């Protein structure tokens, strides 16, 4: 009896001596389904619970800046790198361990100058087209050529998409500001704007337009749901380093204001790990940046995309692109 009591007291003492793992709050600008899948996998692996507050990345970045040291967020998970760059420039992010930063890599993958965020996955800009109206030979060799009279009322785009804004940045870097503004004005005059990439995709599928500029994963999700043999659309990869072949990146960071930095760093490390990348790419057709992970979707190999080696990684680049959209009458 005394022995049993001693063991019980010892177990209680050990439990009391072991610090409890804190739950963490993630401000999530990534697609909620993908973030939830990774959060659930992380909780199963560590026991740490994750609360997701989901909204647009720019909105969340602005909220974090407003909240400052009072922010309840521990981690910022962003669909676009410029939102992370905004917070890095404001010195609101905590440096990450090299072991986390080094998990994801690849040609053209952006790296934080202050090592305070890490890139996690990539999405390819593509042209989705109606196979009932077009074949590959009918499509343009450059995304710039879709902003012309030939494509009047035939080409769709989503001007409020963060990836669209990053594509504008890519055109500025590769072709110059004048070319970017001309492209935007051409799309404004000849193209058809849609509220979302998914809506533009559906418009092509429904035969309303012939083609649209979107991210690859929208089509992959649609084709997986409907069955690829049952859809009328396919993807065209522009390739040869054209801005139309741009890869955009998601990433994550730990906030300096976090009261749970150890747990937050564990979560970001998990996002970059093999386990985290597998959880993400099982539900979303994004390119894993951990070289040991292969997507469950039938993706075009990233090496064959021939993507330009540019990306939007600074606040000024994003602001410049936004001003060009305003000049073109898109905002």
UniProtKB/Swiss-Prot annotation:
The keyword Signal applies. Pfam families: SBP_bac_1. One of its GO terms (cellular component) is outer membrane-bounded periplasmic space. Residues 1-22 form the signal peptide. Fe cation binds at residues 31, 79, 217-218. Iron co-purifies with FBP and is bound by the protein as a Fe(3+) ion at an approximate molar ratio of 1:1. Induction: By iron deprivation. It is found in: Periplasm. CDD domains: PBP2_Fbp. Belongs to the bacterial solute-binding protein 1 family. GO terms for biological process: iron ion transport; transmembrane transport. The keyword Ion transport applies. This is Major ferric iron-binding protein. One of its GO terms (molecular function) is metal ion binding. Keywords: Ion transport, Iron, Iron transport, Metal-binding, Periplasm, Signal, Transport. It comes from Neisseria meningitidis serogroup A / serotype 4A (strain DSM 15465 / Z2491). Its main location: periplasm. InterPro entries: Ferric-bd, SBP, SBP_1_CS. This protein may be a central component in the iron-acquisition system.
